């Protein structure tokens, strides 16, 4: 059963490695579709907010792409895993509260339990989108391998997921990316 709030027409669950461009892609989609039609939901938002409260940290600084956030990343991952083990839908329920737009873009789906929760809760309106980028492209965006982060479940949990409904290649070829976004936007419009 869906939590309180509106029932979406489409839920797109975006996943991908760090610096693959998940936020870039979801923000590009929202800018084309409009914020009145399309909401970007971030599972990391309530996780970081709760973590900041419990650890006396600056929540706003945990939201940006800063060294501040990176210095707490490993412990946040561990803490988030403990929360999910106790209640797999904890963060999922938090992000959908009060969302009124018909299209939901979950920009940071990282675990099978997240996909399962959305599929069980919203059924056929849920689709998975994998954003992929070459290691070289990710490095150009500032990615550096960090042991305990890039080899943790939060980065690798969906590597063997199987058949994603959509795969967006974000290797730096703007024209190719635009073509792919165009196809996805056509699909979104078919659901409105």
Curated annotation (Swiss-Prot):
- What Gene3D superfamilies does UniProt report for this protein, alphabetically? P-loop containing nucleotide triphosphate hydrolases
Query: Subcellular location, in the record's words?
Result: Cytoplasm, Cytosol
Instruction: Quote the cellular component terms of the Gene Ontology held in the record.
Output: cytosol
A Pfam family of the record is P-mevalo_kinase
- Give binding positions for ATP: 17-23, 141, 171, 180
Per the record, the pathway is: Isoprenoid biosynthesis; isopentenyl diphosphate biosynthesis via mevalonate pathway; isopentenyl diphosphate from (R)-mevalonate: step 2/3
Give the EC number(s) listed in the UniProt record.
Answer: 2.7.4.2
Positions contributing to substrate binding: 170
Say which enzyme class the record assigns: transferase
Under catalytic activity, the entry for this protein gives: (R)-5-phosphomevalonate + ATP = (R)-5-diphosphomevalonate + ADP
This protein's record includes keyword Glycoprotein: no
Q: What does this protein do?
A: Catalyzes the reversible ATP-dependent phosphorylation of mevalonate 5-phosphate to produce mevalonate diphosphate and ADP, a key step in the mevalonic acid mediated biosynthesis of isopentenyl diphosphate and other polyisoprenoid metabolites.
Q: What is this protein called?
A: Phosphomevalonate kinase
**Protein's organism:** Sus scrofa (Pig)
Record gene name: PMVK
């Amino acid at each position: 059963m869906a939590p309180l709030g509106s029932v979406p027409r489409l839920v797109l669950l975006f996943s991908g490695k760090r610096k693959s461009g998940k936020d870039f892609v979801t923000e590009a989609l929202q800018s084309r579709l409009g914020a009145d039609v399309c909401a970007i939901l971030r599972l990391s938002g309530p996780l970081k907010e709760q973590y900041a409260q419990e650890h006396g940290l600056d929540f706003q600084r945990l939201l940006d792409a800063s060294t501040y956030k990176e210095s707490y990343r490993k412990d946040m991952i561990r803490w988030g895993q403990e929360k999910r083990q106790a209640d797999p839908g904890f963060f999922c329920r938090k992000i959908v509260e009060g969302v009124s737009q018909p299209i939901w873009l979950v920009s940071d789906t990282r675990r099978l339990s997240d996909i399962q929760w959305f599929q069980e809760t919203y059924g056929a309106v849920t689709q998975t989108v994998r954003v992929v980028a070459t290691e070289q492209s990710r490095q150009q965006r500032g990615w550096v391998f960090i042991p305990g982060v890039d080899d943790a479940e939060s980065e690798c949990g969906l590597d063997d997921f199987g058949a994603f409904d959509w795969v967006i290649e974000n290797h730096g070829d703007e024209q190719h990316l635009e073509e792919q976004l165009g196809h996805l936007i056509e699909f979104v419009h078919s659901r409105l």
